[in-house]
Swiss-Prot record:
Belongs to the KRTCAP2 family. Subunit of the oligosaccharyl transferase (OST) complex that catalyzes the initial transfer of a defined glycan (Glc(3)Man(9)GlcNAc(2) in eukaryotes) from the lipid carrier dolichol-pyrophosphate to an asparagine residue within an Asn-X-Ser/Thr consensus motif in nascent polypeptide chains, the first step in protein N-glycosylation. N-glycosylation occurs cotranslationally and the complex associates with the Sec61 complex at the channel-forming translocon complex that mediates protein translocation across the endoplasmic reticulum (ER). All subunits are required for a maximal enzyme activity. It is found in: Membrane. Pfam families: Keratin_assoc. The chain crosses the membrane at residues 1-21, 35-55, 69-89, 93-113. It is a multi-pass membrane protein. This is Protein KRTCAP2 homolog. Its main location: membrane.
């Protein structure tokens, strides 16, 4: 069952805070070995998707259905926040968060194009015809 964009934004924000707190609580376990540091980066990419969802849904709620999330500033801001949150756990988590987030962004964009149609509209030239000025 679908919820409104405002409710979805609040859910994504709450899940972001919950996951961020969980990463901080289990910081020592996430830094104990290299595979766990990679898991920390993966959790950081989940943070990225949650932040991006929250930002996009709040923009849709406040600016209307036709508003689209752009690469700059929304995606970049979400990526910086997720990488900073991952950096609070371990340095390696920053790199793996970036890699996993780029892959996740590709698949989210692919799903969005499939569901909603063309992602970025192409500019089409309108032919200019010479006619009488008095028309």
């Amino acid at each position: 069952m679908a919820v409104s964009s405002g409710t979805s934004g609040m859910l994504a924000t709450c899940l972001f805070m919950l996951l961020f707190a969980t990463m901080q609580i289990y910081k020592s376990q996430l830094t104990s070995s290299q595979p766990m540091a990679i898991v920390g980066g993966f959790l950081g990419s989940v943070l990225f998707i949650l932040i991006l969802t929250a930002i996009s849904n709040f923009e849709t709620h406040f600016f209307g259905r036709n508003f689209q999330t752009k690469l700059i500033p929304e995606v970049v801001i979400a990526l910086v926040i997720a990488m900073a949150a991952s950096g609070m756990v371990h340095r390696v988590c920053i790199t793996t968060c970036l890699i996993f987030s780029i892959v996740a962004l590709y698949y989210v964009s692919r799903i969005s194009i499939k569901v909603h149609g063309s992602g970025a509209g192409t500019a089409t030239a309108i032919p200019v015809t010479k006619g009488k000025k008095g028309k």
